[in-house]
């Protein structure tokens, strides 16, 4: 919404939001503490959709190792970001570890933990000994989000196509660093 008005999130007010949505302010405050709470819930919702979609695509793919699953998922997410720059800006710039973790652990039945559950199961399935699986996931998400954003949005320092082989190698080495 704030993107369409050209204001940016910082200058968008609750009044702008409720007017655009056709709500009363009281109704807004029944569901959200402030505009940041709304933004965080939207990020959680959209990230949940993204990871569920990635999980469904992964289930249909023919992969034979944990690393191949990670690379497939990485490529899937990057492809989605390349197709929808606004979605990428919204998710990649705002998806902190705390928000990401809440997607999978908030206990809200409207959110799925399929991706996270699959990730944990895949570690066992492929006999990957990772003493800190959440830290591994955090590191990969941070790397993928920040580097893909700059390469896709700004083509800096290079295009995503040029960067992708380096990202894959980096993820390979991160996986080695986190596993025994």
Give residue ranges: language-model regions.
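Helix-turn-helix
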Residues: 6-37, 41, 45
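Hydrophobic/aromatic-rich alpha-helical bundle segments in the mid-to-C-terminal region
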Residues: 124-170, 178
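Conserved small/polar residues in nucleotide/adenosyl-binding loops
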Residues: 1-5
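Amphipathic alpha-helical segments used for helix-helix packing
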Residues: 68, 80-102, 117, 149-153
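Short, flexible helix-adjacent loops and helix caps
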Residues: 8-9, 55-63, 92-96, 124-128, ...
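Short, structured helix-loop boundary elements
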Residues: 14, 40, 44, 67, ...
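Hydrophobic alpha-helical connector segments
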Residues: 41, 55-83, 140
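Amphipathic alpha-helical packing segments from all-alpha helical-bundle domains
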Residues: 48, 52, 99-127, 134-138
């Amino acid at each position: 919404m704030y993107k369409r008005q050209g204001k940016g999130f910082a200058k968008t007010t609750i009044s702008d939001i409720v007017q655009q949505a056709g709500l009363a302010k009281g109704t807004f405050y029944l569901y959200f503490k402030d505009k940041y709470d709304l933004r965080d819930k939207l990020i959680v919702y959209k990230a949940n959709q993204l990871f569920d979609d990635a999980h469904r695509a992964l289930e249909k793919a023919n992969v034979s190792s944990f690393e191949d699953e990670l690379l497939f998922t990485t490529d899937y997410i990057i492809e989605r970001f390349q197709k929808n720059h606004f979605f990428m800006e919204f998710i990649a710039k705002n998806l902190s570890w705390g928000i990401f973790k809440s997607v999978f652990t908030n206990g809200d039945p409207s959110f799925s933990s399929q991706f996270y559950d699959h990730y944990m199961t895949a570690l066992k399935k492929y006999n990957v000994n990772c003493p800190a699986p959440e830290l591994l996931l955090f590191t990969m998400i941070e790397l993928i989000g920040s580097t893909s954003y700059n390469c896709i949005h700004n083509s800096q320092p290079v295009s995503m196509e040029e960067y992708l082989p380096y990202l894959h190698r980096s993820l390979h080495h991160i996986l080695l660093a986190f596993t025994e």
